[in-house]
Amino acid sequence: MRAPPLLLLLAACAPPSGAAVDPTPPGWEPAPDAPWCPYKVLSEGPETGGGRLCFRSPVRGFRCQTPGCETLASAGGSLRAHVLRNRSVLLQWRLAPAEARRVRVFALNCSWRGTYTRFPCDRVLLGASCRDYLLPDVHDSVRYRLCLQQLPLRAEVAVVPPELAECVEFTAEPAAMQEIVVAMTAVGGSICVMLVVICLLVAYITENLMHPTFRRPSLRRQP
């Protein structure tokens, strides 16, 4: 089993006061008795095989804090992507009860835009009980496109056509570059403070040691 510790940490941390938060709308929060989510990652390439079956727990109480998180929605509104500053993306989706009974599996297709064409990335198959998925380690400044499609039950394939995929596009911000800029700004400020202290110290030494003050001769007559 692989449980995402990052999401558990995000769910447990409350947002600070004064920070804008995108609340979880009704219908997006998983049920208290929601089962484990089975999923399988199908990597690209002929030697990757069919993937390994894994399980993850649903995310509860997630809040998208605007300084470090951005929420994007698909055209149909049933798929949401929360782009976090740590280069991970949390996907959430919801279905009507009638639609949920017809779903056999969800297919999550991923691609990213290159200079002249689009390149596919890992494909994920998720069980019918899944309502969220964490996509870790996305690349900075790359335009991603994620599409979630509902695959119906085998008995209803000929009766009910597959639903059109809900897609969302996003670009992860270069968080590492922002951290470097912040660090360089902090270091530059420290250097400026040190230079000011050194200048004051040199001025003090020059004034008091290089040019010592002489006492004036006393005007009192000696007996």
From Swiss-Prot:
It is a single-pass type I membrane protein. Its main location: membrane. Residues 201-223 are cytoplasmic. Residues 20-179 are extracellular. It holds the Pfam family Fndc10. It is found in: Membrane. Residues 72-168 form the Fibronectin type-III domain. Residues 1-19 form the signal peptide. GO terms for cellular component: membrane. The chain crosses the membrane at residues 180-200. Keywords: Glycoprotein, Membrane, Signal, Transmembrane, Transmembrane helix. Glycans are attached at residues 86, 109. It comes from the Eukaryota. InterPro entries: Fndc10. This is Fibronectin type III domain-containing protein 10.
